[in-house]
Amino acid sequence: NYIRLRVWNDPYDENGNGYGGGNNDVATAITLGQRATQYGMKVCIDFHYSDFWADPKKQFVPKAWEGMNIEEKSDALYNFTLENLTQVLDAGVDVGMVQVGNEINNGMCGETDASNVRKLLASGSKAVRDAATASGKDILVAVHYTNIDDMKKLDTLLTGLQVKEIDYDTVGLSFY
């Protein structure tokens, strides 16, 4: 069994007030992840790569990454993933899976161009693999879509990942 814990980049305004919705920063993920680990559950870290909810209609770039080109954003995403996942692992959380992006049907982290989204996915996946190697853990990489009723569209999305050799292990699908 897994518990899925979302992580937002910086869910606080300029005065340090949380946006609400749980203020799911890495510290919160560590606290909840330690509790889940204590009870024998594996943890899936769900990086939204946004300061608040990311879904098919809202894939806003984090404040700290605004104005970055795709190369800079890709590097920032790699570093954010590696640093935060390492913190979670160092805190003793039993991470078995990391979700790179949340509900990325129409884009990710402010990017809508498919090649840019794939570049971000590749950076996130590499960061997960690097953190897993450093910690000696086997951690699955997941990509996540939602409400895809058309199997042809899902096939197109997944074929795009395979053709571009994006490194992932599993696909998460949410339906509401």
Labelled PLM ranges:
Residues 1-38, 42, 48-76, 172:
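N-terminal substrate-binding region of glycoside hydrolase catalytic domains
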Residues 3-5, 43-47, 96-100, 141-143, ...:
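Hydrophobic faces of well-ordered beta-strands that scaffold small-molecule active sites
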Residues 8, 103, 176:
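Flexible loop residues that form catalytic
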Residues 9, 145-147, 174:
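Residue-level signal for short, function-critical loop segments
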Residues 19, 25-27, 54-160, 166:
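Active-site cleft segment of glycoside hydrolase catalytic domains centered on the general acid/base Glu
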Residues 45, 49, 114-117:
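A broad "ordered helical/assembly scaffold" signature
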Residues 48, 129, 176:
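Histidine-centered active-site/metal-ligand motif
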